[in-house]
Amino acid sequence: MSRICDVCGKGPVVGNNVSHANNKTKKVWYPNLQSLRCLDGKTGAVKRMKVCTRCLRSGFVKKAL
């Protein structure tokens, strides 16, 4: 299961957790993806998409009812 937004392509970001003792461990931050039924802009068909909440709030996607 890919954790990538179907609209903007936003995916996981890798960095470090840094403790008080300055120990570093790998950490992955995932985008807030929502699985939606959306209308396709070209054909008007209903498709299942994984969309990040930023794209959803910005109005890049039209939700199907």
From Swiss-Prot:
Record InterPro entries: Bacterial_rp_bL28, Ribosomal_bL28, Ribosomal_bL28/bL31-like_sf, Ribosomal_bL28_bact-type, Ribosomal_bL28_sf
Cellular component annotations (GO), alphabetically ordered: ribonucleoprotein complex; ribosome
Gene3D superfamilies: 2.20.150.30, Ribosomal protein L28/L24
Superkingdom of source: Bacteria
A single BP term in Gene Ontology: translation
Pfam family, one: Ribosomal_L28
GO molecular function, one term: structural constituent of ribosome
Keyword entries, A-Z: Ribonucleoprotein, Ribosomal protein
Family classification: Belongs to the bacterial ribosomal protein bL28 family.
Record protein name field: Large ribosomal subunit protein bL28
Source taxonomy: Bacteria, Pseudomonadati, Thermodesulfobacteriota, Syntrophia, Syntrophales
